[in-house]
Amino acid sequence: MPRTFVYKIGGSGTGLSQADQDNNIHCIYDELKGNYGWSDEAIAGACGCFHEESGFNPGIYETSHGGTLNNLPYFPGGMGLAQWTDYPAYSGSYPNPLPWAAMKDGYNWYDGRYQCFLMTKATDTTYTDMGIGQGARWGWQTSSRYPSTPFDTYIHNSSMSIRDAVTYWFYDFEWHYWEIPDWVDFEARVRWGQYAYDLFHGLSPDPPGPGPGPGPGPGPGPTPTVGKKLPLWMMLKRIPF
């Protein structure tokens, strides 16, 4: 019987059990590999970041900026597996990409399968421009200032290391800037990427220790992080230069 995503709709800190996280990792793999042909490495790179962003819970939304679900698709903060965020970030001035796209296509924003589909649209201007006419508001953005690779190359790359896969996903899909702030535990993303990759291949790895995101997990605390703290205005914009 096909697996189905487990979700809990709730604000920051709404976590899943380890068994449910593992189930969702397999669901992500089934979608991105089985339906869209992504490489195992590319999916693992994304999953490493998903743990730190959402704890693999497609129903989580960020509450630290005062957002509620009463005015969707407008929401100031991150939502879903990849924590799609409104732009300018946290302002609530424009729709959040995830509920905007889901409502346009007739899906619930917390639908994990739909979120996997939306990831495949990271360079499709029909989705990334959101009909606003001001250019991409989210998506895969490359730059000479940080590690970059074309999206189509990334999703089919089966020779890159898990660290490289996490690096490309973090910079090109999520962060869009060349410095990593102190509060980002990049090494946790690499560990969870390897964990997901091992699950894909039938192993039973021990869960890495918890990072700063909502996902639970036994083990030691976060390792030291890399990079410098960004000025506040850059944290809010997160755009390439």
Give the residues covered by each predicted segment.
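Solvent-exposed, polar/charged alpha-helical surfaces in well-ordered, non-transmembrane soluble domains
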Residues: 26-30, 34, 44-47, 117, ...
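Peptidoglycan-targeting cell-wall enzymes and recognition modules
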Residues: 3-27, 31, 35, 51-161
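Active-site or metal-binding loop neighborhoods of secreted/extracellular toxin and effector enzymes
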Residues: 150-208
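Enriched but not universal
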Residues: 1-5, 213-241
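GSAT-biased (Gly/Ser/Ala/Thr-rich) low-complexity helical/flexible tracts used as stalks/linkers
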Residues: 2-12, 19-22, 197-217
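Surface-exposed polar/charged interaction patches
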Residues: 35, 199-203, 239
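Membrane-interface starts of transmembrane alpha-helices
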Residues: 39-43
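Generic alpha-helical structural context detector
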Residues: 47-51, 167, 171, 210-218
